[in-house]
Amino acid sequence: ARARKVNTVVVGRDGRLSGPELSRALMEGICASGVDVADIGMVPTPLGYFAAHHLKTGSAVMVTGSHNPPDYNGFKIMLGGDTLHSTAITALRTRLVEGRLAGGNGNIRQVDVRQDYLERIVSDVKLSRKMKIVVDCGNGVAGAVAPELFRRMGCELVELYCDVDGNFPNHHPDPSKPDNLKDVIRALQETDAELGLAFDGDGDRLGVVTRDGEIIYPDRQLMLFAADVLARNPGAQILYDVKCSRNLARSIRHQGGKPLMWMTGHALIKAKLKETGAPLAGEMSGHIFFADRF
């Protein structure tokens, strides 16, 4: 961090049981290198990125196992506005193993940015009418934010597993697997809700189900998002990963955009998004990246 002239790093964590211990050790290590920490607590990964911009640090580490099994955990790292991946990660590991670390005495401060995050979204995204929706957080950390967000947007909710529990006792929080959407589909059949939304363990991937129980896979979601984004950004590039349907490229061209296929991996997609200045990108895994108004 200091090599990139970073003075403060935001640190957040998802709801996994090992999160408090790992995040505490991480923050102590960051402080021992002379860098300050803004501790934002247990939050979804998108809120961590928001905090890095909102607090003007440009740097954040999310302690998260994403969609992996409950006993897994790890770090998603952004320093100086860049998400670390590939050789940058291996170089960091080498530096840690060799003990080539800076010394210092940073400070930790607790910061609550949830209300700022919610207000940013609610002030920007306006629904044309009220909706009743099913929200399945899979006992992941999205449950700490999503219900309040959708209610503030004017939605009536049918909540499934929105209490955060790192054991994931009901089903695994991975909406890319149809088996994990069965409860959403059942709730849609048993209620008059018109849309189902499901999140992964750290709240940065989305599953969508229609009232008829049809799963709208992420490449089809991108077709809809591209239509909206291209209406405001005619001729813009839209990025997608290699796992998406070839129909996505056709749809983007039909809407006047320029499709660009790129490598799978949220860090790789984000790096290409920054390089190209594209307003929208997405992956078949369910990661969607908006850069037009955010």
Labelled PLM ranges:
Residues 73-191:
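Gly/Ser/Thr-enriched, mixed-charge loops and adjacent short helices
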Residues 4, 126-130, 233:
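Short, flexible coil/linker segments at domain boundaries that flank nucleotide/cofactor-interacting
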Residues 2, 6-72, 119-120, 148-209:
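N-terminal small/polar loop signature for handling phosphorylated ligands or for N-terminal nucleophile
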Residues 12-13, 79, 135-137, 210, ...:
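Short glycine-centered, acidic/aromatic-flanked micro-motifs in structured strand/loop junctions
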Residues 47, 90-119, 123, 211-284, ...:
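Proline/glycine-rich low-complexity loops and linkers
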Residues 19-24, 89, 143-147, 249:
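Short, surface-exposed alpha-helical segments at coil->helix boundaries
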Residues 57-66, 70, 188-210, 215, ...:
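Glycine-rich phosphate-binding loop
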Residues 6-14, 132-134, 236-242, 279:
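Short glycine-rich phosphate-binding loop at a beta-alpha junction
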